[in-house]
Structure formats: structure tokens, C-alpha cells
């Protein structure tokens, strides 16, 4: 069970009081959201019967809530064949806009290591100009932490903004659906 607080018209979810929290962002093949929702839900249900998959305000984008640790959920979900899931992004850290540089620095220090090479993918849905500002901020923090940004890296650092929520995670750059098709 989690608590919802409403403060000045903004809803805050207290994930600390509940083990269920956002662990994955899933993008779906165009016009296949219902099937994609069932696919990802069925895969994770085996490990977590409380898994919840929610549509976002954006076409073909889902948020997955689970009791599982983010790395376990990502591992379970990533190594499956899918017909309708396009990509799976782990959520290691969450925040809200505007992004606090101290939060971002702490998050990036926890999920990366000095000497690591990452491909940086920043996507802001529903907020103009935010992605370029966040991109610059993340690049500067990564530089301070001794992490190289390389477009050829197979490890991606994802920073996803959905409305006013910011999700940060590290995972494979390989899209799940496309990987399954090309590997067969």
C-alpha cells in the first residue's frame, strides 16, 4: 500500500512507505499498447504478482510499478522475446522538475563508475527545451565523475522526463523488439 498526499494541487506518491514503486519505462510498438501492456505484465507477474502497468499521457509509453528491485525487474523483463514491447528502460532514480543538480550528481554517482563509458539518451515528453538543458547538466556531471559519453557505447544512461517526473537509469542500448527480430 502506498500513500497519496495532495499538497497545493500536486500529488506526491510516498514510495518509501510501500515497496511498490516505478521500476521500468516500457515503450510499445505503434498502436499496440494494450498488447504490450499484457506482455510486460505477464512476464513480471511470475516474479511479482503485485506488478502494475500504467499507461502514461504519451502514446506507446508505459510505466511499470513493482515490488521487485529495479535490477531484478529489468533483468527479468529484458531477457524475453516480445512481439509488442519496443524498449525497456530501468528506473534507478526518480525526481521531479526542475532537476536538482545535487540529486542528479548523487544518482549518477550511485549507478555509474569512474572510467565507465555510456551513451547518453535524454528524452523529455511534454516539456519544451528541458531535454537540452538536462543533457548539458548530465554531461557536465558525468565529466566531473570521470565517466565518458560515447555514442558507440552499448550501455545507455537514460534520462526520461514524463510531464514533471524525471526518471534516470542505466541499461542496454539495444531495443528489445528490434533485437529479437534481428537475432532470429
Give the residues covered by each predicted segment:
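SAM-dependent transferase fold signal centered on methyltransferase-like domains
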Residues: 2-184
Amino acid at each position: 500500500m502506498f500513500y497519496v498526499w495532495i499538497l497545493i494541487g500536486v500529488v506526491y506518491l510516498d514510495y518509501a512507505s510501500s515497496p511498490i514503486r516505478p521500476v521500468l519505462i516500457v515503450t510499445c510498438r505503434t498502436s499496440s499498447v494494450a498488447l504490450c501492456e499484457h506482455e510486460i505484465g505477464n512476464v513480471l507477474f511470475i516474479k511479482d504478482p503485485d506488478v502494475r502497468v500504467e499507461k502514461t499521457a504519451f502514446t506507446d509509453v508505459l510505466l511499470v510499478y513493482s515490488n521487485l528491485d529495479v535490477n531484478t525487474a529489468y533483468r527479468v523483463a529484458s531477457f524475453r522475446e516480445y512481439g509488442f514491447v519496443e524498449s525497456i528502460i530501468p528506473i534507478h532514480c526518480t525526481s521531479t522538475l526542475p532537476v536538482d543538480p545535487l540529486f542528479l550528481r548523487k544518482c549518477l554517482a550511485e549507478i555509474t563508475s569512474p572510467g565507465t563509458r555510456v551513451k547518453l539518451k535524454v528524452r523529455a515528453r511534454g516539456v519544451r527545451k528541458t531535454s537540452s538543458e538536462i543533457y548539458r547538466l548530465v554531461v557536465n556531471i558525468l565529466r566531473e565523475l570521470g565517466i565518458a559519453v560515447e555514442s558507440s557505447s552499448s550501455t545507455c544512461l537514460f534520462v526520461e522526463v514524463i510531464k514533471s517526473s524525471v526518471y534516470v537509469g542505466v541499461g542496454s542500448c539495444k531495443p528489445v523488439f528490434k533485437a529479437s527480430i534481428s537475432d532470429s
